[in-house]
Amino acid sequence: MTRGAFGLMCVRTILGWLLVAALMSGCAGPGQPTISPDLGETRVAPSARVLLTVEPTVTLMAIASTASTPTATLWPTATSTAIATLLPTATPSPTASPTCTPGPTPDGVARTLRVPILMYHYISSPPADADVYRRDLSVTPAQFENHLKYLVDAGYHVITLDDLLYALAQGRELPTQPVILTFDDGYEDNFTNAFPLLRTYNMVGHFFVISDFVNQERPGYMTWSQIEEMAAAGQRFGSHSRDHPNLNGKSDDYLVWQALGGKEALAEHLGQHPHWISYPAGQYGDRTIAVYKSAGYWGGLTTQQGTTHTLDDIFELQRVRVRGSHTAEDLGRLLELDW
């Protein structure tokens, strides 16, 4: 190679290197990757690390992909847990849907049973200006306790209306000398005076309330909280209609309104539908019986005097009226009568 040719080649080589250096200098700018001659790692300017570096981008995508899997697994789990905690059921417990239990299926055997059903109203002393009706319906707490003492001493056993029905329909055995205690109208003194005495003597009564009067919180009548307390302690409740009308000769629509209104009001507060209706003032008719029977009631109570019952008369049960003038001895004589 001639000296001139060698010089020309050197010049070209130098110019080539200068061109490469210029290109690299022009392309490299802030945030672009540079190769570390010592570590061989990728370095990225903080402001552009994610956007411009390939490996971090791939790394973030992998994290996102990894995170997406737990998201699909964890989020539904967390959501279902929250729902299970905050919304356990559609209906709050313990007042679940009110139960409506069908009555016992008759076994086909005709039975006649003698079971006195005592009928009380007020358990309190009548006010000084009370009329003759109020005085007649008022049994003082002292009288009432004497009545309960007499029942115990004379060997009577307090049963429920349900017990009577099962005995008539299926022959369920009753204790000797059974008797049933009923209270009409739902007066407040039934809670303040009768209820404590019934607990003392370990007895149960049937209380027939006028549901609209309770809803309206009428003075002198039990409240729902009092009724709930008594029911929780084992006392029984039935309907005395919505507003104490004469149920005889009314249209079916009106009777349905009365039957279902009284029934649903008690079910809402006690968790079960009442089984028994006490006809207001003892006034009822054939259509009354038919409607209350179709509404799921098990039977009805009248104000007619008597102590003998059959299954055919379960919607016309007779009772023994207890008056304000009756002593324990008077009650004993009433219980012994063969009505």
Predicted feature descriptions by range:
Residues 195-202, 222-238:
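Acidic (Asp/Glu)-rich catalytic clusters
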Residues 29-112:
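Ser/Thr-rich, Proline-interspersed low-complexity disordered segments
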Residues 219-225, 255-258:
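Charged helix-capping and loop-helix junction motifs
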Residues 24-26:
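C-terminal motif of bacterial Sec signal peptides marking the signal peptidase cleavage site
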Residues 2-15:
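Bacterial N-terminal signal peptides that target proteins for export
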Residues 118, 183, 236-244:
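Histidine-centered catalytic micro-motifs
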Residues 46, 51-52, 64, 87-88, ...:
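C-terminal active-site subregion of NodB/CE4 polysaccharide deacetylases
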Residues 202-222:
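A short, conserved beta-to-alpha structural element at the edge of catalytic cores
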